[in-house]
């Protein structure tokens, strides 16, 4: 019995702290079906705020707190940005945007399993993913292991930093939320 106990103690001494954190982040992601959160998004010098719901895999609905009535919706295949006040309507295949990877929980889990933590401080854990010539920084809260935000370069080559707060997990959702809005002229 002492031999087994010694082996267990030895194993935990050689297990890097990073491995434990990575396992916790991965387990948290695996348990997460959806999240709702407030966000602050900085694109170049412009700051926008709003609320989003992510429903894995690859669905998102965001409503911006602005006077324009801006929304962003992905049904898992396509991404639409619609601005109600101006009638502007932008349609993109999701696979051509960096959000395609951010919204893919299984992709994130696979990458985190392969990566080392790229940065860490008392509050945040960061993983840097490079995929298809895109650099994506994914942030997690060190204490809760919740997704905390991401940094990407958007399809217009703008640096986009999104930080999230007030997270609610695994809520009952109406899937109609993720239907693409119609274009209105």
Please describe what each predicted stretch is:
Residues 4-13:
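Sec-dependent N-terminal signal peptides
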Residues 16-19:
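Boundary at the C-terminal end of the N-terminal hydrophobic targeting segment
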Residues 27-47:
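A short, Trp-centered hydrophobic/proline-enriched beta-strand micro-motif
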Residues 31, 53-59, 74-78, 121-122, ...:
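Short, solvent-exposed coil/turn segments at beta-strand boundaries
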Residues 37-39, 60-64, 79-82, 127, ...:
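Short hydrophobic/aromatic-rich beta-strand segments that constitute the beta-sheet cores
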Residues 52-101, 160:
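An acidic-aromatic
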Residues 85-124, 129:
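Flexible, surface-exposed loop/linker segments and immediately adjacent secondary-structure boundaries
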Residues 110-185:
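Gly/Pro-enriched, hydrophobic low-complexity segments
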